[in-house]
Amino acid sequence: MDRAEKREFVAWLNGAFKESGSVVVAHYTGLTVAQMSDLRSKMRDAGGSVKVAKNRLAKIALQGTESEGIADLFTGQTVVAYANDPITAPKVAVEFAKANDKLVILGGAMGATTLNADGVKSLASLPSLDELRAKLVGMIQTPAQRLAVLTSAPASQIARVIGAHARKNEAA
């Protein structure tokens, strides 16, 4: 990589750090190419990205971003996972790390908040924004459904009473 390519890469990575909702940093020593491709495809399917970057370039790219506090995590063979949704990158990275012990979560950032490995794992256990929206819609719809059942119940009960009374009169 010559200087121009490095500048372009740092500018691109800086933009990715600024736009992302969360960033996860992990060691990937010992992962095979197939495992790394699997991680990338899972992250891409979830709406995130995985990037292997030189530590020095990643530290430069972090300057001027909210995630600047994670610069100390860039030692050794590191991989960066990031996504616009704050839950996506931690969730996919932690799930992948459970299946592949060679991916070791070092920490990350969510906005200006720096997270250690346990913080990333806690963040991964939270529901995503789409899941929360679905739960909220379900909670909003439930009272309306109950109200519809309650308002229709008295009318149907009255109809049953009248029908039973009519059958009783016919039998007599």
From Swiss-Prot:
SUPFAM superfamilies for this protein: Ribosomal protein L10-like
Entry's Gene Ontology BP terms: translation
GO MF term set: large ribosomal subunit rRNA binding; structural constituent of ribosome
Record-linked Pfam families: Ribosomal_L10
Coiled coil residues, start to end: none
Gene Ontology CC: large ribosomal subunit
PROSITE patterns with a match to the protein in the record: RIBOSOMAL_L10
Cystines in this chain: none
Alphabetized UniProt keyword annotations: Ribonucleoprotein, Ribosomal protein, RNA-binding, rRNA-binding
Family matches, as InterPro entries: Ribosomal_uL10, Ribosomal_uL10-like_sf, Ribosomal_uL10_bac, Ribosomal_uL10_bac_type, Ribosomal_uL10_CS_bac
Subunit record text: Part of the ribosomal stalk of the 50S ribosomal subunit. The N-terminus interacts with L11 and the large rRNA to form the base of the stalk. The C-terminus forms an elongated spine to which L12 dimers bind in a sequential fashion forming a multimeric L10(L12)X complex.
Cited function: Forms part of the ribosomal stalk, playing a central role in the interaction of the ribosome with GTP-bound translation factors.
Entry similarity comment: Belongs to the universal ribosomal protein uL10 family.
Name of the protein in its database record: Large ribosomal subunit protein uL10
Phylogenetic classification of the source organism: Bacteria, Pseudomonadati, Pseudomonadota, Alphaproteobacteria, Hyphomicrobiales
